[in-house]
Structure formats: structure tokens, C-alpha cells
Amino acid sequence: MAISPRSDATFSSQKSTPSESPRTKKFPLTEEEIFYMNCRAAYLTVFKSSLENIISKDQLYLALQHAGRNPSQKTINKYWTPQTAKLNFDDFCIILRKEKPTSKAELLKSFKQLDVNDDGCILHTDLYKFLTKRGEKMTREEVNAIINLADVNADGKFDYIKFCKLYMTTNEQCLKTTLEKLEVDSKLMRHQFGNHIEGSPERDPSPVPKPSPKITRKTDPETFLNKGDTRSSLLSATRKFKTSVSFTVTMGANGNRNSKLMEPNLIKDWQHMQSKGCFFLEEDGEIISHQYRMQIAQRSMVYLTIKPLNLSQVEGKPSPWLSVDTALYILKENESQANLQLVCFTELRNREVFGWTGELGPGIYWLIPSTTGCRLRKKIKPVTDEAQLVYRDETGELFLTKEFKSTLSDIFEVIDLDGNGLLSLEEYNFFELRTSGEKCDEDAWAVCRENFDTKRNELTRQGFMDLNLMEANDREGDPCDLWVTLHSMGYNKALELTEACPFVIDIYAEKCKPKIKAVHMEACSGQLEKAICKSVLSNGDAKVMDGYENIIVHTYSCDTWITSVIENKSDEKVIIHISNELSKNCINNRGLNIFAVEVGPKSTMVCQHVMPLNERQEWIYYCIYSLIS
């Protein structure tokens, strides 16, 4: 697990000057980057810094309005409960993901209910009654403010078509204004920090010269400030860092092939077990997956691999999620499940396969799958066309569409963990927990076996199809529940798998038959976070904050990704500001170039994972860690 020396991966703390970082081409922002830019623009309209917290309902309401939302009091109360003391910028982003902006069509549909003459207008008396007596009631003054809008009112009538157009135009103008303000502030910050590079550095995969050795190791952002310039209170408020430390890692295109994963000799003679599983992306961006127990009966050489599962039936057109990184952390159980010791992880790679080879003693091991979140992430792009799931023939009988049956077949392939072509109760229950939050008990499973096609007391693929058809029939053809199932499994309205990544684990043992069983489906945190921190602390490059020996930044680099961990040995919490603005051809799991993390006393935390945006080109990781408090 030690990091091997490599000629194309170097650690330094040197900073590139602007003249050394020419930008040759601008790349369009991704939907994800546009989303975060809009979030940041709205947040900074209300606060001086994204490090400030929302501390009241009024602030939350105002920030949501600037983000183009029109939250009701019910919505505000959902996110600001009696137990809420504060919300940070990350919380704000999560809320915006869940609360979609009101569309023009939705507004028109709401007003049209009151349009008795179907002429695009509503009588002021009807509008007044509706707004003051229905739903979340408005005050007389609030209604009068609407009625007094000259552009949309005339002759005692409210022109709701004009109002909707005005509403959408105003929203767009507000967003444009906040984005323009953000760009002005960003240019000012780049100017004051000596960085005149335009655009988003993460979007430029072009090679850049290596950092000049003339720049000193420690970076003090205050030395770059134009001290005579008082235009930005944001800079003076948040950029006075106590100390900083930086890392640079330069990686060649396609990684370093010296560490390529190799199969052991005579592996065909080893005993083999396999299990499938899946990473699922939650609404808040958290990733959950199956977790496993593995039993090794006697000391043996073991070869472990994990890779994304290809479901494509079209030759030459693999499943799009094959680019998602996967890893497997192996922990040994000592006396109890609570006492797990990190043994190794699959750091070697051959294309989409990640693996590890070594000797394991007899015992129980936990296999915890991991993905960085750099590539398995929320897709902001909306899907306009909804796939049809069911149809009726000329007799009125309900059937599943060909497209939906194909999707169900893929889902069956994913949840059939042992790959025997059948679903056991245990396998089916992982599916039920994911889609409904409940388990199927023995009695319900017996009923299922009586009514649907089974083999050896396990559900067949056809039985699984018929089970979903029954669900559609129970709802008289309404596909609502079917869509809940599909969304839970990571599919969008076009039946594309965009928020999940199925994978397959292979275990080979030389001297015994290994056993593997899926036992949980949990968030990729907790034990996994501890395992990642321990592996990075053991194998990474460590740098101490100058003057603060209790704060250490650890950075681990392999051919595929870079992980940083912050260790706080002090008795107080610290806030660390992270800037990736000078990184090239990089993407991180947080989706932000600049962010801050709070590290509790006597604790370690994973700060970020970074991967190349384009693996076929060189990528440069340049990150500055600064102590705020």
C-alpha cells in the first residue's frame, strides 16, 4: 500500500505565476458547475462569504428567493425546525436540489383554476378571496401590492398571463444580476491574489508548465492583497488566514502504468467466489452501497477485484457508468464487528478493474466498497421526455412496455447478487429496503412464491416481471409506484441509469474456498471514513501547518485519484479553507473549487477526493489549505 516513487508524480509547495499558466481554450461549464455557481451567487447576495451560516428563517427565506425559489412557510418550516440553530452553504445547496424553481407552466396552471371566462384574466374580487382564504393565506397589504401592479392589472382584472411572464423575467434578471456580481467579485479576488486567469481552472485540461522553483514554500495569501484597495469587504473579512500550506501533484496522462494490476500466475486453479452490488446516490448527494462479510478458512494468497458491472447488450457500446471509480477496503474482524482493523484496499488498476493481491490469515473480513463521488454525482440536466412504462391492448389488458421490461431485466441483474439467475429472499429484501424501506417477511415471501414463477424457492426473472405488472394493475395502470421504484434504483424519466453504479466483486483464494455474503446496505461513511483516513495517514505525504504543529494535512496519490485528509490533534475545532483554483484538468467530489471544512478536536476527516476530468491528458492538483480559526 506504500506509494511507489514515480517520475511523473511530484509533491511540492510551489505556486505557479500567472505567466506560467496560459489558458489556451475555454471549456463550457457542466450542469453541475452551473448549479453550484448559481447557489454561490444567491448565497453571496445575502452573505459576505459562503463560510457564513444562515442563522434565521428570514435569512433562509431571502437566500432561497435570490436563488429563484418562492418558498412557502411550510417549506421554510421543513428545513428550519425548532431544533435548527444554523445552516451552512452545503445545507443550502442540498435544499436547492430538493426545491425546484416554479415553472411558468405550473404558475399558469394554478391561476387558470380561477379563470372562469378562460380569457387569461381573474377578477380582483376572486383573486382577493383566493389569496386571503385558501392555502397559505396572504395579508390584505400583500394582495393589494399585486393588484396595484400597473403592468398586469386593468379594469378590475388581474392579467395572470402577463404576470407569469413578468414573474419569470424578473427571476431571470435577478439571477443574471447575482451572477454578474459574483463574476465581478471573482475578478477582483483573482486580481488581488495575483491570478489573472479567466474562467474556471477546473475546466482546462491543457498541459501547463510545472511550477517555478523560485517561489517560496509557504503561501501567505495576505501578501497578494492590494492593501490600498478597499472595494472588497469579503476579502478583508475572510482572507486573513493564520497560516497556509499547499500541495502540488502532477500526474501524467492515463496514470502511471508501473502500478498496473496483474493477475497471479495459475489463477485459474484458485477457488473463486463472486458477488454483485450497487452504489446508490441519495438526494443529498450521499452514496450508499452493499457491504459484505468474507470468510477465509485458512491462511492463503488472495486476489480481490472490484469493477463496475456492464449491463449493455450492445457490442462496442459499454454502459456509461464504467468510468466510475470503484475501490474495496478490507477490514479484519477482531472479536466483534465493532473492532475492525484495516488490512488493505484495492489501489492497483487495470482499466476499470481495481484489485489487490496478498496473503490473508484465517478469519472474518469486512469488504466495504467505495467510490470517490467525483464521477458518480447528481445530474442537473432535466429530462423532458418521460418513458412509457405500461400500455393496454385493444381488450383493455395491461402490459409492460418493451423498454420497461428491458430496464426491469437490468434491475434483476443488479439485485441478483450471487448471479445464479434467481432472487432469494435475502436478495429481494435488499431491493425492497431500497425501494420501499421495508422488508418482505417469510409469510409474504410464501405468498409471492405461490403467485409468481419461482425455482428452488427463489423468484425467477419472469416472476419479477409479473410482480411489477401486478403492482401496475393494482394501481389501475397508474405508473406512479413504478416510478418510485425506478428512481430509487437510480433511473431517470428516460429510463437511463444516472444515479447508481452497479459493481461486481471477485475473490480468488489459492488454498481454500472463500465465502462472501452481503449483510448491509449503508452509507459510504462511518467505518469507511475511518478506513480511508487510516490508509491516507499511513501512506500519504504529510505537511504540518506552519506554527500549528497539531494541524496536519495528509495527501495520498495513486494513479487514479488523490485523497486529502486533515488531522486535528488540538483540543479545539478548526476551520480550514481549501482552494483548488489553480488545479488543472481536475474534478473533486465536492463540486466546488473553493470551500471550507470544520474539523473537530482530536479527529481526522476526509477533506476531498480529486480525479482527472480527462484521463487522456495530464492533470495537475494544486491545493492551498489555509487555517481560518
Swiss-Prot record:
SMART domains: EFh. GO terms for biological process: positive regulation of protein import into nucleus; positive regulation of protein localization to ciliary membrane; positive regulation of transcription by RNA polymerase II; protein localization to motile cilium; regulation of smoothened signaling pathway. Residues 102-137, 138-173, 403-438 form the EF-hand domain. The keyword Calcium applies. Its main location: membrane. Residues 7-21 have a biased composition (Polar residues). Ca(2+) binds at residues 416, 418, 420, 427. GO terms for molecular function: calcium ion binding. Keywords: Calcium, Cell membrane, Cell projection, Membrane, Metal-binding, Phosphoprotein, Repeat. Component of the EvC complex that positively regulates ciliary Hedgehog (Hh) signaling. Required for the localization of the EVC2:EVC subcomplex at the base of primary cilia. This is EF-hand calcium-binding domain-containing protein 7. It comes from Homo sapiens. The gene is EFCAB7.
